[in-house]
Amino acid sequence: MRSDSLPTTICQERKKDPIEMFHSGQLVKVCAPMVRYSKLAFRTLVRKYSCDLCYTPMIIAADFVRSIKARDSEFTTNQGDCPLIVQFAANDARLLSDAALLVCPYANGIDINCGCPQRWAMADGYGACLINKPELVHDMVRQVRNRVESPRFSVSIKIRIHDDLARTIDLCRKAEATGVSWITVHGRTVEERHQPVHYDAIKMIKENVSIPIVANGDIRSLKEAENVWQMTGTDGVMVARGLLANPAMFAGYEETPLKCIWDWVDISLELGTPFMCFHQHLMYMMEKITSRQEKRVFNALSSTSAVLDYLTDHYGDESLSKSL
C-alpha cells in the first residue's frame, strides 16, 4: 500500500466529502471501479476532466489484509487522489473491516462489490451473489461501522438488480437501515450482459429509499449522463467503459481530445505506469480518432519510446497538441 508519504491528517481532512456531494442536488459524476484500469494514473486523468469521485479497482479484501505484497500492488494513492472510494470484494465481515481499517486514513470510504457477475467471483462468494445474501451484507456493513471510528467514512454497496424488482427494493431498504451511505445500481440482472439497461428499475429503487442512489450502465457521454440523472431522479451517475473510451467525457467532449492524450502521457511517465497499462488506455482513447490501418500499427507498438514517437509523428509534439 503506497501513499507517496501522504500524511494521515491530510487524508482524514479531505475537503470534498462524497456524502455531502450526493446531497448537493447537483449531478455527481463518478468513475467506476474497473479491474486493471481505474488505478491512480487513470483516476488522476479523469479528475482533470470534471470527474467528481473515483473508485479503485475491485480489491479482494482477504488478500489485501493478509499480504503486504497485495497491498503494495493493489492500492496506490497521493494527495490529489480525492475524494476516493476503495472497492472491496468480500464475504467475511471481520476481514472486510480489517481492510477498511487499513485504508481509512487514505480514502473517503469503502464500497462492497455486490454486483460483479463473473463466475469466479460468485463461486468464491463475492460480487453479485451477495444480492441474495442481505444478512451477510448487513453484517459486513455493521462491522465496518463499529470498527472505523470516523463518522465521515462512507460505506456503500454496488449492486445489480433481481429479476423480481421487489427483492432489490427490499435489499436496498435493508441496506439503508443498516447504515449504508449510498447505493450504486447497475440496471441489469446478473444474467444480462448487453441488454438495455433498466433505468425504470433504478428510478423505482430511488423512489423507495432515502439515501443517495447512483445510476450505472451504458452511459457514453455527458449528455447521456445528464439524461439518465434526470430520468431516474438519482443523485449521481457512474461510468466505466465510456470513460475508458473518452476520459474527458464528463467535461463535455464527444471524443478524446488530443490534450487529454498528452495529459495521459505526462501522468503515466510521472507515476511510472507499466507499459501494458499505458498502451492499453491509449488504445481505448484513440479508438474513434484512428483509422483501421493506424490501429494495426499503433496496437503493435511494444515500448514507451515507440508510442511517444508515434504520437509525436501523427499528432505533433506535446506543446502543439496542448494548444489545440
From Swiss-Prot:
PROSITE patterns from the UniProt entry: UPF0034 (PS01136)
Cofactor needs: FMN
Domain of life: Eukaryota
Key word Flavoprotein present: yes
Active site per UniProt: C116
Cross-referenced CDD domains: DUS_like_FMN
Residues reported to bind FMN: P33, M34, V35, Q87, K158, H186, N216, G217, D218, A240, R241
Keyword Membrane: no
One Pfam family, short name: Dus
Family annotation (InterPro entries): Aldolase_TIM (IPR013785), DUS-like_FMN-bd (IPR035587), DUS_fam (IPR001269), tRNA_hU_synthase_CS (IPR018517)
GO MF annotations in UniProt: flavin adenine dinucleotide binding; tRNA-dihydrouridine20a synthase activity; tRNA-dihydrouridine20b synthase activity
Protein name: tRNA-dihydrouridine(20a/20b) synthase [NAD(P)+]-like
Species: Mus musculus
Organism placement in taxonomy: Eukaryota, Metazoa, Chordata, Craniata, Vertebrata
